Amino acid sequence: MRMNTARLVLIMGLLATSPAFAVDHQVKMVDEGAEGNMIFEPGFLNAKAGDTVTFVVKDPGHNVISRHVPPGADSWKGTVSQGFTVTLTKEGVYLYECDLHKMLGMVAVIQVGKPVNLEAAKAAAAALSKKMAMGAERLDEYMGKIR
């Protein structure tokens, strides 16, 4: 009886770490939020490979476009005023933006597992910050959360 219980516990543990238990994270695209105007909420997301991110339109007139992804990861581009879901398949740092409001600082960061492309992501963030009229400090703050 104890052997069957031990096997059951082992099997349950293995199943709990499988991709079948991936999380769907929700990121809102908003005109005005807790961290300012023209933002993604949350602006920094920590996820695992296999998780999905669903970008939810709370205020129309926004889209989501990846600007930097880890090696081997697919880039993405959503349609203006429409929700969008992406599956995060590779570990690393992902930078994304609203194409219409990036100049206003509508950018955000996702870390998936280990930040294997951290130096390249930092360089991409620095280049992106130079093109922003406002909100660059937001991107710096999000990049500072990477561990």
What is each of the regions a protein language model found here?
Residues 1-9:
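Bacterial N-terminal signal peptides that target proteins for export
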Residues 21-147:
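Extracytoplasmic copper-binding redox domains, predominantly the cupredoxin/blue-copper superfamily
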Residues 17-18:
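N-terminal signal peptide c-region/cleavage motif recognized by signal peptidases
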